[in-house]
Structure formats: C-alpha cells, structure tokens
UniProtKB/Swiss-Prot annotation:
Pathway assigned in UniProt: Xenobiotic degradation; (2,4-dichlorophenoxy)acetate degradation
Keyword Glycoprotein annotated: no
Residues that coordinate or bind FAD: 8-37, 301-311
One Pfam family named in its UniProt record: FAD_binding_3
Cofactor(s) for this UniProt protein: FAD
Protein name per Swiss-Prot or TrEMBL: 2,4-dichlorophenol 6-monooxygenase
Family: Belongs to the PheA/TfdB FAD monooxygenase family.
Enzyme superclass (EC): oxidoreductase
Length: 598
C-alpha cells in the first residue's frame, strides 16, 4: 500500500523562496514539509546581494547575526570597477550599494540593518536549519512529480530518489518554489509573459589569491571589457567576489543561438586568466556551469490551494541583485496569511491577496533587471568597442581617451556619463524598499497619492496604508537602549502603534482579540511609556498625532491608519481587521482546521 503523509503545507524547493517559506511557516507553528530533489542545498554561490528589506526578514526570524557571520559586509561591496583586466588599466569606478558618502545616510536612515553580500550557498542552509529546528520536516533527494487538488486539500505525488519509491503527501496547501524551470508552474499552467533564454552566460567558480589586485578597491563586482566580452551573457565580462579575496566567480558570455559551448578546464583557466590579466596567478577551477538571461514573469501566482514563489514566477538576470531578495519577500507575504487561515483567524479569501500584492512586484523586478542590462552598452560604445573590426583596433579605440585634444576629451566625457548611467543598476534603493501594496488586505485611508522624489532611486518612508512601516529608533524607558520600530512589530503578529494620547487603542485591540480571536500588540510611544521618542523621529515620520494609530501586518506593511482618534476606535479597528482578514461575512468559521496557534 502506497505511503501517504499528511501535513498542513508542502513546500517544493529549498532555494531562497522555499527555504524562507519553510522557516517562516514553521516559526508560525504551521505543520510544514520542505522537499528538495537534490541531496543538499545550492552547491554554488548564485544569488548574493542581500538588501535591507531581506535582512529585516532574517532579523525577524532571529537569523541576522548568523547570516552576517557568512556575509561580506557592506563596506567591502562598493568600489565597482570597470577595467581591461584586474591587473590592467581601469576605465572608471562607481560607488555602489549605498557606499557613496552622498547616499550612505539614505541607507542608514531607512532600516535597522545594512545590506551585505551573502552567497546563496551560505544563505540556504541557514534558512533550512531554522525551519528544521522549528519543526519543519525537511527531506532531500525527494522529487515532486505532480499534484491534484480538491476543495479540502492537495495530494502531491513524490519520489524518494534514494530508493525509487513513490508516495503521496496530503496537504492543505502546496507552495511551488522550484525555480525558473518550475514543474509546479507548468502543472498549473500559470500565465507567463516575456521571453526565456535571451542570451547565454558561463559561470566559472574558482579559487585564487587576488588580494594584491583588489583589496585596495574592495568590491563585489569587477567589470572587465576585453575582446569578446560583449558576446552574449550580460554583455560584459565579470569577476565576482565570493569570499574576500580568494574565492571568485567569473562570468563570460556565449552566443545563445549556437547553444552552450563545451567548456574544458583549460578553456576555463584561459578565460579566468584573461580576466585577471596575469597568467602567473595560481588558480583552481571549482565549478563550470551555464545559464541564460531571462525576461519573464507570471501574472497570476496561485491557483486554488497551490501557490508559486521565487524564480518560478519572476525570471530575470542578476542585475540589481533582486532575485533572492524578491523570492524571500514573496514568502514573507504569503506565510503569515496561510498561518492565519489555518488557525481559523482569517478567511481563505485573504490568500487571494498574495497574487494581488506580489504579481506587480514580480513584473517590476523583471522589468528593472532587464532594463539595467541596457545600461552597460553605452560604456562599450564610449570606448569604441562596437566600431572596432579587430582586437587591435579595439585596443586603439580604448587608448584614444588618454590623448590630449577635444576628440579625446569628448570620449572621456562620454565614458564618465556612461559609467554614471549605471547608477540605477547599483543604487536603486527605491526599487528595493518602496514596495507598496493595494489589496483587500489593506484599508485605504483616502490620503493623497504619494509624490516620489525618484521612486526607483530613493527610499521614501510613509505610513500610508500599503507602505512598509518606517524604521526609526525609539528608546526603552527602563534602560534607555534604542530599538527599531521594525523590531517592535512582526514575529507573525499584528502590531498597533500609537502615541501617548492613544490609550483608547488598547481597548480597541482588546475588542479585536475578544471578537475575532486575533492578538494585536499595542506599542505606545511617548514620555513615560515603555518606549520614548527622544529625538522626535517617530512623531516626525508617523504622520499621525498622539491619538492616532498605525496597524502593521506581520509582514511589516501598514494595513490601517487613523491619523487621530475616531469616535469609535474599537468599532473602527474591528471593522478594519475584519476587512484585512476577509471576515466581513464571518465565513471563516467554517474554515477552522486543527493547527497550532500562530
């Protein structure tokens, strides 16, 4: 008789989306099984840029300190260099990831965390371990074969790749986080827009001590312009730091029309030595793989009881470093909703807001990452590469900028402008931090639309419903230690911020608990309260007066705001929470299932 295992949620894939979904669901008390058809997590670095929003999620899980043990800090990320080779001449640099003194305050002001470089092969085990420690059942060598769903759940067919036996997992919900070639997406036939395989890239993982070439200009990425560097891939050669300064990933392109080439170790060594510019450097090739640049996103992320997340639904090049970040943020949006539906405090209609909120983000990041590819050709154009008919002519065109005279001066100007034009590739802080949601799980307050300085380049704090709760430091009244407003919310719970005149909101939160069974943590900020606003930053950024309130969802997004105390605070808050949870008609009473409370 075939084995059947029961669980609340089955997650397919242990990449950033799947591993974070497993960790979050387990933390929220949901019975979860996490599977991977391979024998361990990602063996190669893959994604690596880890932005502040993602670090906030790791912080919410209590994993920030562990993540930083394996990450290169922000200070080592910023001297992005464009050069002929690491040992050769430079064409220019651009300060990146907020390391420019003119941008650092923007980054420091918006989050209690800083971004870092955390390769995927170090990140995934942290998340998987967290999931397992919180009770998630983790199985490797377990392949997803297909599923059938009905009104009560999902039956997924799996294969144990160690013994070849097939078995069934019966779950309330299924999450497909199985990458850009997602079988779950294919089974659901989710609508996809865009193009796959636009160009081809070669990844060469290698060890080499390159300290003397890079330690004085620390960066994550070194962009190398050489003959052939404009063919396929990203349109430019790359040497990426994996571990400073002895583990690296070289990226070179290939013509996708001709298919991936056969890459011998000697060929790989030649590419790497050319990028370094010094054949005498000892090196060890540790891995060779190919991949393609994609431009595709799903317009619907779910069907019935099955959801898809991560690269399965947004497939794009690594420019802007959005891949693993967006994947983890997908799971942060979805996990609390599933948990609250399973424990009976939310209606299943809440789950529909996953697509409503995250599909626009999927489109945004795919479009931004592909648009960023267009920012590199002007550098090659300024150096005269496309015009050259031979390697010698290419070198001559590049050298011309070192001459005196108006022609060379014009070339230098074009080059500086072209390099500066990559600013939206590296410092698009708004793309990372300005995500806004508009769905039934957000109670609009009819405030005017925000006017952004530059929605892609600069973070803009707001407590307008749908925006992420802003970070400011407040101070514990007992010992005076600072704590972020972000640290006062999350952890799978709703949080209500108010001022010293908002004591009535405590009664309102109690009414929500009494009538809806949902706990709301109340944070009163003000003199003599548990948390004080010594610098006035909370008063400045909250956009409410002392009697108003800001309701924050478990995923840090503002769900409801009252700029002042309404006549019936309890009635208003209960009504808002009913809408957020989809319980206007109280249909959820029929949906209660056995699960540990969130």
């Amino acid at each position: 008789m075939a084995l059947t295992i029961e669980t609340d949620v089955l997650v397919v894939g242990t990449g950033p989306a799947g591993a974070s979904a497993g960790a979050l669901l387990a933390r929220y008390g949901v019975r979860t099984m996490l599977i991977n058809k391979y024998n361990w997590t990602a063996p190669t670095p893959r994604a690596h840029i880890t932005n502040q929003r993602t670090m906030e999620i790791l912080r919410d899980l209590g994993l920030e300190a562990e993540a930083r043990l394996y990450a290169a800090p922000n200070d080592l990320m910023g001297e992005n260099t464009i050069c002929a080779s690491l040992a050769g001449e430079e064409f220019g640099r651009i300060r990146t990831w907020g390391t420019d003194v003119r941008r650092r305050a923007d980054y420091d002001e918006c989050s209690p965390t800083s971004m870092c470089d955390l390769p995927q092969n170090y990140l995934e085990p942290i998340l998987v371990k967290s999931a397992a420690l919180d009770g998630c059942k983790v199985r490797f060598d377990t392949e997803y074969l297909g599923h059938e769903q009905d009104a009560d759940g999902v039956s997924s067919r799996l294969r144990d790749r160690l013994n070849g036996e097939e078995f069934t997992v019966r779950s309330k919900y299924l999450i497909g986080a199985d990458g850009a070639n997602s079988r779950v997406v294919s089974d659901l036939d989710l609508p996809l827009e865009g193009t796959m395989g636009k160009s081809g890239s070669i990844n060469l993982l290698f060890e080499a001590d390159l300290d003397r070439y890079v330690a004085h200009r620390p960066s994550v990425l070194y962009w190398v312009i050489q003959p052939g560097s404009d063919i396929g891939g990203l349109g430019i050669g790359v040497v990426r730091m994996v571990r400073p300064w002895n583990k690296w990933l070289a990226i070179w392109g290939y013509d996708v029309e001709q298919g991936p080439p056969e890459i011998s170790e000697s060929f790989a060594r030649r590419i790497v030595h050319n990028l370094i510019g010094d054949d005498s450097v000892p090196l060890k090739i540790e891995g060779i793989s190919t991949w393609t640049v994609n431009d595709m996103y799903a317009t619907r992320l779910q069907q019935g009881r099955v959801f898809c997340a991560g690269d399965a639904v947004h497939r794009h090049p690594p420019t802007n470093g959005l891949g693993s970040n967006t994947s983890i943020q997908d799971s942060f949006n979805l996990a609390w909703k599933i948990a609250m539906v399973l424990n009976g405090t939310a209606d299943e209609s809440l789950l529909d807001t996953y697509t409503i909120e995250r599909a626009p983000i999927a489109k945004q990041v795919v479009c931004r990452a592909n648009k960023s590819l267009e920012d590199f050709p002007p550098i090659a154009m300024a150096l005269g590469l496309p015009q050259a008919k031979s390697a010698d002519e290419m070198k001559s065109n590049m050298a011309r900028r070192k001459e005196p005279g108006p022609e060379a001066q014009a070339q230098r100007t074009r080059l500086r402008e072209a390099i500066a034009g990559t600013n939206y590739v590296y410092n698009a802080h708004g793309v990372e931090m300005n995500q806004r949601y508009d769905s039934p799980a957000i109670v609009a307050d009819n405030s005017p639309d925000e006017v952004f300085r530059d929605v892609e380049l600069y973070h803009q704090a707001s407590t307008r419903p749908g925006a992420p709760m802003p970070h400011v430091w407040v101070y514990a009244s007992g010992d005076g230690h600072r704590i972020s407003t972000k640290d006062l919310c999350g952890k799978g719970n709703f949080t209500l911020f108010t001022g010293i005149g908002g004591a009535a909101w405590q009664d309102a939160a109690a009414a929500v608990s009494r009538q809806l069974g949902v706990a709301v943590t109340v944070r009163i900020i003000g003199p003599g309260q548990a948390y004080e606003d010594h610098y006035g930053d909370f008063a400045r950024i909250s956009e409410i007066i002392d009697t108003g309130a800001i309701l924050v969802r478990p995923d840090f997004h503002v769900a409801y705001r009252a700029t002042s105390l309404p006549a019936d605070a309890a009635g208003d808050l209960v009504s808002a929470m009913r809408r957020i949870l989809g319980r206007q008609s109280e249909r959820s009473s029929a949906l209660r299932v056995t699960s540990r409370a969130i």
